[in-house]
C-alpha cells in the first residue's frame, strides 16, 4: 500500500514547489537570452539580403496607411466643396444648367484621379507586403533548417555523461518546440514589427506636417489614455496574483488529497476534503468577481476616454476650420494619421514578444550547440592501431557517475583479461559490474586510474575506432523501428547480405527469421515490439557479431528471457565467445560456470578471482550467491520459469545495499525507461482526446443555467454595445456634413458642439454598458468555474482506486485538469456569447442604417466586405493551420530524433551517430522545401488582404462620387454608409480575434462532463448495501483470483484461500510482489476480486455498504501519509463520521506510545506536521498513524509492513505500540522482517499468489521449507 506514496510523491513534490515559486518566479524570472544579432548567426549573405530587402519592403508597406489618409483628406475637401456648391445652387433659383453638370463632371474626374491614387498605393502595398512577408519567411526557413541540423549534430556528439544529467524528453521538446519558437520570432514577425514602426513614424510625420496644433491636442490626450491603462493594469495584476494564490491554495489541497487518495478512501475523508477544497474555491470566486468588476470598469473607462478624445479632437478641429486655419480634410487627415500611428505601437507588441521568446529559446539551443563534449565520438584525433589482440586491463580505476558525483561506484578496481579469455563478473546489484563494461567502451572516463587495450590507455585511442572493435549485447537490447536486416546493418555500415546471414546463423536466429513471412525484410516495430525477448536478443547478438569485434561485452544478456529462450541464446553466446576476449555479467550464475575466470565484485572492488570450483571452496561472495540461488531453486522446482524473479528477490534480501543498487540500475536503464514513458505520455494524450464524446455549446451553457438573470442583462448590454459602432458612424458623418453646407459660422459652431457632445454621450453609454456586460458575464463565469471545479473534484474523489492507477490519471494530470478545464470553459461561454451578440448587433444595425441612407453604395460595399473578410479568415486559418501542418510534417524527423536520442547508448555503442544524423537531415528535406513554398503562398495571401482595403476605398469613393454627381446621395450619406459598413466589419474582425479559443474549451467541457458522469465500479458515495449491527471480525478468502486492472497480464492472486478467526493475528510473509499487500487492499475494497469471494462474518463484502465496511477497518501502512495540519487533526482523521473529542485523541495517542513525545512539543497537539508529515521522523509519523487507526476503534486492524521503514530503536517502540493495539482485535500483519511476527497466531507463506506453507513460527521452522530458508537468510545477513 505504499504504492500511493511512491507513485504520487514525486508529482506532488514537483507541483508543490511550482505553486510556491510561482509568484517569486514572476518577480525575478529573467531568463538568459542571446543578443539580438547572434539570433541570426546562421544566416549567410543570401539570408541577409532577404532580410534587408524584406525590411525595406516592410517600411514602404507601413507608410501606406498614413499616406492614404492624406489622399482621403484632400478628397473630403473636394466633396465638401461640392456639397457647399450644391447647397449654393439649391439656394439660387435661377441657375444655368451648364455650370451644374460641368461642376459635377469635374467632381467625377477628380474622384477618378483619387481612385487612381488609392489604387496606386494599393498596388505598392500589394508588392511591398508580399516581399516583406515572403522574404522574411524565406530567410527564417533557411536559417531554421541549419539550426535544426546543427542542433541534432550537437546532441549526437555529446558524451553519455551529458545525457545522464539532461532529460531525454526535454531534448525532444527543444528540437520541436524551442526551434519553432525561434522560427516564430525571426520570421515574418520582424517584418510586421518594422511595418508597425513605419506606420507609427509616418503617421506622426503626416500629422505634424499637415496640422501640428491638432496633433499636439490629440497627443495631449494620449498620456491620459496610457496612464489610465497602466493604473488599471497594476490593479488588475494585483487581483490576478491574489486570484492565482487562492487557486494555488485550492490546487494544493486537491493535490494533497489526490496524492494521498488511498488514505482518504480508507478513512472515508472525502466529504471533509471536499469542504476544505470548497472553502478555498469560495475565496477565489470572491476575488474573481472583484477582478471582473475592476477589469470591466477599466474597459468601460477606456472607451469613455477614447470617445471623449474624439469629442475633443473634433471640437477643436471645427474651431480651427471655422477660424479658417484648416480645411475639414486636413482635420480628418491629422486625426486619422495620428490615431493610426498611435494604434500601430500596440500592434508591434506580439512581434516583440515573439522575438523575446525566440531569444530565450535560442539561448538553450545555442548553449547545447556550443557545448564541447569531453569524449568526442566525431573526433578524428587519437591512435588507430593496425592490430588489436584484445588484452584488457583495468588499473586502480575509481569512478562515480557525473549525475551523482557523491556516490563512488568503483573504488580502485584492478582486473586483467588475457586475449581470448572469458571473464565473468558477479556480485550484488549496484556493485559496479555494468560500470566496468561502460568504461571499457569509453562511454565515461574513470576519475582515477586507467583502462587499457593491449597496454595502450584507451584515452589515447581514437574513440570511434575503439568502439568499432567492441561488440555489446545488453540486458534490454534496443532494436530500431526498421527491418531485421537494417537492424543488423547498424552493426557495421557496408556489410553484405552473406555476412548478415553468417552472423544470424552464429546467433541461432536464422531459423526463426526464415519462418517469418518477409524474412529479413520483416519490420520489427518500434523498439522491436513485434518480436519476443529471445528473438530480439538474438538479433542483437547478430548485430554485435557482424562487426566481427575483437572484444565482446555481454551485460546480463540472458536475464530477461524465459528458460527456453535462454538456453538457445546461451548456446549462441557460447559460439560467439570463441576466439574473442569476452566480459560477461550475469545474475544467473548457472550461465557463467564455464568462464575462464570468475571475478567476485563487492562495493566497487574485486574481492575474489578464480574458476567455479576454486571459488566454491573459498566460501566467499560467489559461494553465498550460488547457495542462495540454488536454495531458491529447490523450493520452486515446479516453477522454474519464475526463477529469475525469486532469485532477484533473494538477492535483494541478502544485499543490504540493495537500495543504492536500485538507484544505480535505474540510472543505466534510464534512457530506456524514459523513452517508454515518453511514448506512453504521447499515446495517453492522444487516447485522452480521442475517447471523449464531443459536447454541444448548449450542453455547456446548461451548466450555467441558474445564472440566467446575469445572461439576460449581459446580452442586452452586448446588443447596445453592438449598436454603438453604427451610432458613431452617424455622428462622424454628421460632423463632416456640417462643413458641406453653407451655413453661417454660428450655426456650424452650434452643430459641431452638439455632435462633439454626442460623442461624449456615446462614451458615457459605452462605459455603463461595457461595464455591465463584462461584469454580468464575468460573475456568471466565476460562479460556473467554482461549480465545475467542485463537481469535478467531487467526482474524482468518488472514483475507485483502479481509476487512480491508470497512468492517465496521475496526481499531476488530475490537478492540471482541475485547474485548466474549468477556466477554459468559463472563457468560452461568457465572452463567446457576448462577442456573438455584439457582432450580430453591430453588423445588423450598421447594414440596416446603411440601406436607409444609400442602398446602392451599401450593395457595392456588401459585395466587397465578404472578400476582405474571407481573405482575413484565410490568412488566420493559414496562420493557425500552418502551425499544425508544420508539426505534422516534422513528425517524421521527430521520430528519427526521438529514436536516436532515447536509445543514445545503443547508437553510441554501435558508432552510428553519423548515420542517424544523415537520416535526420534527409527527413528535413521535405518540410524545408515546403517551408520555402509556403513563404510565397503566405506572402501572396497577406499582401492580398492588405491591399484589398485600398482597392475597396478606391471603388467605393469613385462610385460614391458618381452617386453624388447624379444627386442620388449626398457626400454626408456616402461617408455614413462607408463608415457604418467598413467600421462594422472591422470591429467584427477585431472582436472575433479576442474570442478565446473555443475549440480548447469544447475539449475541456467534454473532459469535465465525462468525469462528472463517470460512475465508478466501487462507489464510495453509495448508500446501498448491508450495515449489520454487530461485527465479530472473522475474515475468509475463498479461492480468490485477482490481478491489477492496469496490469491485466500479470496474475497476482491465483486462487487464494485464507481464514482468520475473530481476535486472531494472522501474519503474511513472502517475497516482494507475491500478493501480500493485495490481500489488505481487497479487504478494504479498493478493488474487487475477479473470481472467488472475500467474506466478513460469513457475508460477502460486496454486499456490505462500502462506507460501513471501511469504518470498521483500521489501517497502518509502510509509509503512512499525514496531512498538512495539526497532530490532533491528523489523529482525528481516523474517524471522519463524527467529531472526535480531545480525550479520545489523547487516549489513542497513549495507546500508540506517542503521547509523551507530543506533550514535549511546544505546541503539543496543535503542532503542524508539515506537508506529508515532513516535520516528524519516520517512527513518530508511524505512531501517529497507529493512533489515527485506533481512534476509529476498528474491529479489524491491518498492518502493512508498519515497521519496515524504521531504524531498530523506533521499531522497538512502534512494535510495542502495535502489540498493545492488537489486543482483542482481528489483526492481519504483513512483514518483511520476520522477527516481528514470531508471536502471531498463524503465519502464512505466500508464493505466486497462493499459500505455500502455514502454521506457527515453531511449526514452520520444523518444516525446514521456504519460511525456514527466509529466516536463516535474514539471520545470516544480521550476523554479518
Curated annotation (Swiss-Prot):
Location relative to the cell: Cell membrane; Apical cell membrane; Cytoplasm
Alphabetized InterPro entries for the sequence: AAA+_ATPase, ABC1_TM_dom, ABC1_TM_sf, ABC_transporter-like_ATP-bd, ABC_transporter-like_CS, P-loop_NTPase, Type_1_exporter
Phosphoserine PTM positions: 660
Subunit structure: Interacts with PSMB5. Finds in a complex with ABCB1, TFPI2 and PPP2R3C; leading to the dephosphorylation of ABCB1.
Domain (ABC transmembrane type-1): residue spans on this chain: 51-357, 711-1000
Membrane topology: Multi-pass membrane protein
Record field: compositional bias (Basic residues): 662-672
Membrane-crossing segments per the record: 45-67, 117-137, 187-208, 216-236, 293-316, 331-352, 712-732, 757-777, 833-853, 855-874, 935-957, 974-995
Variant or mutagenesis effect after changing residue 893 to A: Risk factor for IBD13; has decreased enzyme activity
SUPFAM superfamilies documented for this protein: ABC transporter transmembrane region (SSF90123), P-loop containing nucleoside triphosphate hydrolases (SSF52540)
Effect on the protein upon substituting residue 887 to N: In a colorectal cancer sample; somatic mutation
GO molecular function terms attached to this record: ABC-type xenobiotic transporter activity; ATP binding; ATP hydrolysis activity; ATPase-coupled transmembrane transporter activity; carboxylic acid transmembrane transporter activity; ceramide floppase activity; efflux transmembrane transporter activity; floppase activity
Stretches the record annotates as Disordered: 646-685
Protein name as it appears in the record: ATP-dependent translocase ABCB1
Residue span(s) of domain ABC transporter: 392-628, 1035-1273
Family: Belongs to the ABC transporter superfamily. ABCB family. Multidrug resistance exporter (TC 3.A.1.201) subfamily.
Cytoplasmic side: 1-44, 138-186, 237-292, 353-711, 778-832, 875-934, 996-1280
Reactions catalysed according to its record: ATP + H2O + xenobioticSide 1 = ADP + phosphate + xenobioticSide 2; ATP + H2O + phospholipidSide 1 = ADP + phosphate + phospholipidSide 2; a 1,2-diacyl-sn-glycero-3-phosphoethanolamine(in) + ATP + H2O = a 1,2-diacyl-sn-glycero-3-phosphoethanolamine(out) + ADP + phosphate + H(+); a 1,2-diacyl-sn-glycero-3-phosphocholine(out) + ATP + H2O = a 1,2-diacyl-sn-glycero-3-phosphocholine(in) + ADP + phosphate + H(+)
GO terms of biological process kind: carboxylic acid transmembrane transport; cellular hyperosmotic salinity response; cellular response to alkaloid; cellular response to antibiotic; cellular response to borneol; cellular response to dexamethasone stimulus; cellular response to estradiol stimulus; cellular response to external biotic stimulus
rRNA-binding among keywords: no
Function description: Translocates drugs and phospholipids across the membrane. Catalyzes the flop of phospholipids from the cytoplasmic to the exoplasmic leaflet of the apical membrane. Participates mainly to the flop of phosphatidylcholine, phosphatidylethanolamine, beta-D-glucosylceramides and sphingomyelins. Energy-dependent efflux pump responsible for decreased drug accumulation in multidrug-resistant cells.
Residues annotated to bind ATP 2: 1070-1077
Glycosylation sites: 91, 94, 99
Gene3D superfamilies for this protein: ABC transporter type 1, transmembrane domain, P-loop containing nucleotide triphosphate hydrolases
Tissue note: Expressed in small intestine. Expressed in liver, kidney and brain.
Side Extracellular, residues: 68-116, 209-215, 317-330, 733-756, 854, 958-973
Amino acid at each position: 500500500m505504499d504504492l500511493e506514496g511512491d507513485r504520487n510523491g514525486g508529482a506532488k513534490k514537483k507541483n508543490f514547489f511550482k505553486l510556491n515559486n510561482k509568484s517569486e518566479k514572476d518577480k525575478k524570472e529573467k531568463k538568459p537570452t542571446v543578443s539580438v544579432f547572434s539570433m541570426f548567426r546562421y544566416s549567410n549573405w543570401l539570408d541577409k539580403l532577404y532580410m534587408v530587402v524584406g525590411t525595406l519592403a516592410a517600411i514602404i508597406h507601413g507608410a501606406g496607411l498614413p499616406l492614404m489618409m492624406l489622399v482621403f483628406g484632400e478628397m473630403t475637401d473636394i466633396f465638401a466643396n461640392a456639397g457647399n456648391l450644391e447647397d449654393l445652387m439649391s439656394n439660387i433659383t435661377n441657375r444655368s444648367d451648364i455650370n451644374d453638370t460641368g461642376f459635377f463632371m469635374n467632381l467625377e474626374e477628380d474622384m477618378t484621379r483619387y481612385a487612381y491614387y488609392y489604387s496606386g498605393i494599393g498596388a505598392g502595398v500589394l508588392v511591398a507586403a508580399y516581399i516583406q512577408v515572403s522574404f522574411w519567411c524565406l530567410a527564417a526557413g533557411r536559417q531554421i533548417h541549419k539550426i535544426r541540423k546543427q542542433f541534432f549534430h550537437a546532441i549526437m556528439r555529446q558524451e553519455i555523461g551529458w545525457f545522464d544529467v539532461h532529460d531525454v524528453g526535454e531534448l525532444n521538446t527543444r528540437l520541436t518546440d524551442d526551434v519553432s519558437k525561434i522560427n516564430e520570432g525571426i520570421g515574418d514577425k520582424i517584418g510586421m514589427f518594422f511595418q508597425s514602426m513605419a506606420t507609427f513614424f509616418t503617421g506622426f510625420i503626416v500629422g505634424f506636417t499637415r496640422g501640428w496644433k491638432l496633433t499636439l491636442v490629440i497627443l495631449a490626450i494620449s498620456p491620459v489614455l496610457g496612464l489610465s491603462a497602466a493604473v488599471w493594469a497594476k490593479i488588475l495584476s494585483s487581483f490576478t496574483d491574489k486570484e492565482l494564490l487562492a487557486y494555488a491554495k485550492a490546487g494544493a489541497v486537491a493535490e494533497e488529497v489526490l496524492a494521498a487518495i488511498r488514505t482518504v478512501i480508507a478513512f472515508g475523508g472525502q466529504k471533509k476534503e471536499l469542504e476544505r477544497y470548497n472553502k478555498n474555491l469560495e475565496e477565489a470566486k470572491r476575488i474573481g468577481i472583484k477582478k471582473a468588476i475592476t477589469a470591466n470598469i477599466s474597459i468601460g473607462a477606456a472607451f469613455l476616454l477614447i470617445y471623449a478624445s474624439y469629442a475633443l479632437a473634433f471640437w477643436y478641429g471645427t474651431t480651427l476650420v471655422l477660424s479658417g486655419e484648416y480645411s475639414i480634410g486636413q482635420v480628418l487627415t491629422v486625426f486619422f494619421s495620428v490615431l493610426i500611428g498611435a494604434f500601430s505601437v500596440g500592434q508591434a507588441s506580439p512581434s516583440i514578444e515573439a522575438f523575446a521568446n525566440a531569444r530565450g529559446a535560442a539561448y538553450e539551443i545555442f548553449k547545447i550547440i556550443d557545448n564541447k563534449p569531453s569524449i568526442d565520438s566525431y573526433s578524428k584525433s587519437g591512435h588507430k592501431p593496425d592490430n588489436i589482440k584484445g588484452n584488457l586491463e583495468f588499473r586502480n580505476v575509481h569512478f562515480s557517475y557525473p549525475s551523482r558525483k557523491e556516490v563512488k561506484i568503483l573504488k580502485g578496481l584492478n582486473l586483467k583479461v588475457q586475449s581470448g579469455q572469458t571473464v565473468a563478473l558477479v556480485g550484488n546489484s549496484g556493485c559496479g559490474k555494468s560500470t566496468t563494461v561502460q568504461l571499457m567502451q569509453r562511454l565515461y572516463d574513470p576519475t582515477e586510474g586507467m583502462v587499457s587495450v593491449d597496454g595502450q590507455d584507451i584515452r589515447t585511442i581514437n574513440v570511434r575506432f575503439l568502439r568499432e572493435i567492441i561488440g555489446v549485447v545488453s540486458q534490454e537490447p534496443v532494436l530500431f523501428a526498421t527491418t531485421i536486416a537494417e537492424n543488423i546493418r547498424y552493426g557495421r555500415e557496408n556489410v553484405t547480405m552473406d555476412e548478415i546471414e553468417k552472423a544470424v546463423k552464429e546467433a541461432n536466429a536464422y531459423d526463426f527469421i526464415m519462418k517469418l513471412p518477409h524474412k529479413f525484410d520483416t519490420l520489427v516495430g518500434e523498439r522491436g515490439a513485434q518480436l519476443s525477448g529471445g528473438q530480439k536478443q538474438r538479433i542483437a547478438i547478430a548485430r554485435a557479431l557482424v562487426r566481427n569485434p575483437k572484444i565482446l561485452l555481454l551485460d546480463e544478456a540472458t536475464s530477461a528471457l524465459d528458460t527456453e529462450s535462454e538456453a538457445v541464446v546461451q548456446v549462441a553466446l557460447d559460439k560467439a565467445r570463441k576466439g574473442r576476449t569476452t566480459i560477461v555479467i550475469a545474475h544467473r550464475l548457472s550461465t557463467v560456470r564455464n568462464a575462464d575466470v570468475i571475478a567476485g565484485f563487492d562495493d566497487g572492488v574485486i574481492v575474489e578471482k578464480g574458476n567455479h570450483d576454486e571459488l566454491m571452496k573459498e566460501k566467499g561472495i560467489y559461494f553465498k550467491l550460488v547457495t542462495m540461488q540454488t536454495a531458491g531453486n529447490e523450493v520452486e522446482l515446479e516453477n522454474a520459469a519464475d526463477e529469475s524473479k525469486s532469485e532477484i528477490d533473494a538477492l535483494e534480501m541478502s544485499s543490504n545495499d540493495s537500495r543504492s543498487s536500485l538507484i544505480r540500475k535505474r540510472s543505466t536503464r534510464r534512457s530506456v525507461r524514459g523513452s517508454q514513458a515518453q511514448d506512453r505520455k504521447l499515446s495517453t494524450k492522444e487516447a485522452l482526446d480521442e475517447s471523449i464524446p464531443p459536447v454541444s455549446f448548449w450542453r455547456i451553457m446548461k451548466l450555467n443555467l441558474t445564472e440566467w438573470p446575469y445572461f439576460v442583462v449581459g446580452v442586452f448590454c452586448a446588443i447596445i454595445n453592438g449598436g454603438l459602432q453604427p451610432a458613431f458612424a452617424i455622428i462622424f458623418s454628421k460632423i463632416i456634413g456640417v462643413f458641406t453646407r453653407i451655413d453661417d459660422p454660428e450655426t456650424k459652431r452650434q452643430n459641431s458642439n452638439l455632435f462633439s457632445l454626442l460623442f461624449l454621450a456615446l462614451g458615457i453609454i459605452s462605459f455603463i454598458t461595457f461595464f455591465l456586460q463584462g461584469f454580468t458575464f464575468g460573475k456568471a463565469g466565476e460562479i460556473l468555474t467554482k461549480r465545475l471545479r467542485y463537481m469535478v473534484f467531487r467526482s474524482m474523489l468518488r472514483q475507485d482506486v483502479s481509476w487512480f492507477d491508470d497512468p492517465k490519471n496521475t496526481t499531476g494530470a488530475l490537478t492540471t485538469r482541475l485547474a485548466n478545464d474549468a477556466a477554459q470553459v468559463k472563457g468560452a461561454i461568457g465572452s463567446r456569447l457576448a462577442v456573438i451578440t455584439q457582432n450580430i448587433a453591430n453588423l445588423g444595425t450598421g447594414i440596416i442604417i446603411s440601406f436607409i441612407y444609400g442602398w446602392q453604395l451599401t450593395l457595392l460595399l456588401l459585395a466587397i466586405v465578404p472578400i476582405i473578410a474571407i481573405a482575413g479568415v484565410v490568412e488566420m486559418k493559414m496562420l493557425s493551420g500552418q502551425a499544425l501542418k508544420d508539426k505534422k510534417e516534422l513528425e517524421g524527423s521527430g521520430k528519427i530524433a526521438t529514436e536516436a536520442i532515447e536509445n543514445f547508448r545503443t547508437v553510441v555503442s554501435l558508432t552510428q551517430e553519423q548515420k542517424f544524423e544523415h537520416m535526420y537531415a534527409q527527413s528535413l528535406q521535405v518540410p524545408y522545401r515546403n517551408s520555402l513554398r509556403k513563404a510565397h503562398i503566405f506572402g501572396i495571401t497577406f499582401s492580398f488582404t492588405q491591399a484589398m482595403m485600398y482597392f475597396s476605398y478606391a471603388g467605393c469613393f469613385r462610385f460614391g462620387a458618381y452617386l453624388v454627381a447624379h444627386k442620388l446621395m449626398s457626400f454626408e450619406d456616402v461617408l455614413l454608409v462607408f463608415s457604418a459598413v467598413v467600421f462594422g466589419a472591422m470591429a467584427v474582425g477585431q472582436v472575433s480575434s479576442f474570442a478565446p479559443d473555443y475549440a480548447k474549451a469544447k475539449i475541456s467541457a467534454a473532459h469535465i462532463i465525462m468525469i462528472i458522469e463517470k460512475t465508478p465500479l466501487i462507489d464510495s458515495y453509495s448508500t446501498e448495501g448491508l450495515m449489520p449491527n454487530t461485527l465479530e471480525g472473522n475474515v475468509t478468502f475463498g479461492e480468490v483470483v485477482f490481478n491489477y486492472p492496469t496490469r491485466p497480464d500479470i496474475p497476482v492472486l491465483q486462487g487464494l484461500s485464507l481464514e482468520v478467526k475473530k481476535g486472531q493475528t494472522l501474519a503474511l510473509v513472502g517475497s516482494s510482489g507475491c500478493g501480500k499487500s493485495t490481500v489488505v487492499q481487497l479487504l478494504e475494497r479498493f478493488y474487487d476480486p475477479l473470481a472467488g469471494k472475500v467474506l466478513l462474518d460469513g457475508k460477502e463484502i460486496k454486499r456490505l455498504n462500502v462506507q460501513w465496511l471501511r469504518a470498521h477497518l483500521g489501517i497502518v501502512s509502510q509509509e503512512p501519509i499525514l496531512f498538512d495540519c495539526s497532530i490532533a487533526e491528523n489523529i482525528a482523521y481516523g474517524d471522519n463520521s463524527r467529531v472526535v473529542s480531545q480525550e479520545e485523541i489523547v487516549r489513542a495517542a497513549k495507546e500508540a506510545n506517542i503521547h509523551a513525545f507530543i506533550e514535549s512539543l511546544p505546541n503539543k497537539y496543535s503542532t503542524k506536521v508539515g506537508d506529508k508529515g515532513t516535520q516528524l521522523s519516520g517512527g513518530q509519523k508511524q505512531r501517529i498513524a497507529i493512533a489515527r487507526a485506533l481512534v476509529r476503534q476498528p474491529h479489524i486492524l491491518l498492518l502493512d509492513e508498519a515497521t519496515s521503514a524504521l531504524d531498530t530503536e523506533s521499531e522497538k517502540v512502534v512494535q510495542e505500540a502495535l502489540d498493545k493495539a492488537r489486543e482483542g482485535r482481528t489483526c492481519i500483519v504483513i512483514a518483511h522482517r520476520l522477527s516481528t511476527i514470531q508471536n502471531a497466531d498463524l503465519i502464512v507463506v505466500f508464493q505466486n499468489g497462493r499459500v505455500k506453507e502455514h502454521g506457527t513460527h515453531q511449526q514452520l521452522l520444523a518444516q525446514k521449507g521456504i519460511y525456514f530458508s527466509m529466516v536463516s537468510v535474514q539471520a545470516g545477513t544480521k550476523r554479518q
